[in-house]
Amino acid sequence: MGTIKQIKAREILDSRGNPTVEADVILDSGVMGRAAVPSGASTGTREAVELRDGDAGRYLGKGVRKAVENVNTVIADALCGMDASGQRALDDRMRELDGTDNKGKLGANALLAVSLAAARATAAERGQSLFRYLNPEGPWSLPVPMMNILNGGEHADNSVDIQEFMVMPTGFDRFSEALRCGTEIFHALKKVLQDRGLNTGVGDEGGFAPDLPSNEAALEVILEAIDRAGYKAGENVWLALDAASSEFYQDGVYRLASEGREFSAEAFADYLADLCARYPILSIEDGMDESDWVGWKALTDKLGDRVQLVGDDLFVTNTRILKRGIDEGVGNSILIKFNQIGTLSETLDAIAMAHEAGFTSVVSHRSGETEDTTIADLAVATTATQIKTGSLSRSDRVAKYNQLLRIEEELGEQADYPGLAAFPQLRRG
């Protein structure tokens, strides 16, 4: 038993230069666990509350001193003396202290920092890697990476509507080889863009953000990059999209500003289905607005047997909302962002519910990240089989890939890489 002796938090900066919460959980043995909390750019309205100070004279109102103070006083007073390995008891106690449905009193950023730091402290106390602590007996699986190599929407200052254009290297036996593939495609894409006289600056998540005339133009330059790198789109590399449709949905209409087009839900489902018919797209995230359940159902009925349809803003890592999706046949996958729900226990519950229902799960970063690599261990421990942690630049993104390389090395022959088997519910022919 590792008894919690001290909990302390501080304000640090994330990858976008905004404050976030970092917490240390120190055990009576002197062992410490440390965790930092990410922050999103495009956020679902039902996400747990990220407590900000609102003081316009400091960090443009985005300071987190209130959340830090809540950790150092209310949470520390309640949790010191508890067993750090009792993850659910710790998380339940913090939820009781908060007393709201959305963690708006103490802040999900306060709760999550402590929740993750406690897990790290216990793993360190036991001399285990975090993924082994979370799942001591296995099985473990290295995830297929969704590599966001071209950014649009809220993640970039350009004219592309779709937020993320990703590559998924599936035709490989090891994660390290899949990572090499994605890296080579990333560098090839830079050359493709340079040859066309396009900008090669990067967005929040490390992907390129060129000013392209349409969403299809983005797909075309990626296909050219895959070919130049020596890989085969639709064979050993597939494409994935994060439409982030809530960002361009208003009054029942989906508006693609870059193309000057407007769609009803049914018509936008047809638009996405047409893209999937003409391009090797295996996964679409947030293809409909978070509140458009009718549209989501139409999209699922149209594509759900052959394309992974991931709910991010739709499900917000919340088991209550996920259960509705499962019951109504909406989507077939959930994006997992632990700051959407605010504790490790609730995150694990969402993954378990998804897998029990035959849904896939994709463990994800946020656009505002830190050097914290917890999501890499979480993906391996839960056999999520997929991870989304940005492009192949910016150390806040690459840190997660590097942690997965270390885990692969530690697992040795047990380091399973699923490839296309990560998508068991999809019909391919």
From Swiss-Prot:
GO terms for molecular function: magnesium ion binding; phosphopyruvate hydratase activity. (2R)-2-phosphoglycerate binds at Q163, K337, R366, S367, K388. Its EC number is 4.2.1.11. Pathway: Carbohydrate degradation; glycolysis; pyruvate from D-glyceraldehyde 3-phosphate: step 4/5. The keyword rRNA-binding does not apply. Keywords: Cytoplasm, Glycolysis, Lyase, Magnesium, Metal-binding, Secreted. Binds a second Mg(2+) ion via substrate during catalysis. It comes from Alkalilimnicola ehrlichii (strain ATCC BAA-1101 / DSM 17681 / MLHE-1). GO terms for cellular component: cell surface; extracellular region; phosphopyruvate hydratase complex. Belongs to the enolase family. Catalyzes the reversible conversion of 2-phosphoglycerate (2-PG) into phosphoenolpyruvate (PEP). It is essential for the degradation of carbohydrates via glycolysis. It is an enzyme of class 4 (lyase). SMART domains: Enolase_C, Enolase_N. It is found in: Cytoplasm; Secreted; Cell surface. GO terms for biological process: glycolytic process. Mg(2+) binds at D242, E285, D312. InterPro entries: Enolase (IPR000941), Enolase-like_C_sf (IPR036849), Enolase-like_N (IPR029017), Enolase_C (IPR020810), Enolase_CS (IPR020809), Enolase_N (IPR020811). Its cofactor is Mg(2+). The active site is at E205 (proton donor), K337 (proton acceptor). This is Enolase. Signal peptide: none annotated. Component of the RNA degradosome, a multiprotein complex involved in RNA processing and mRNA degradation. It catalyses: (2R)-2-phosphoglycerate = phosphoenolpyruvate + H2O.
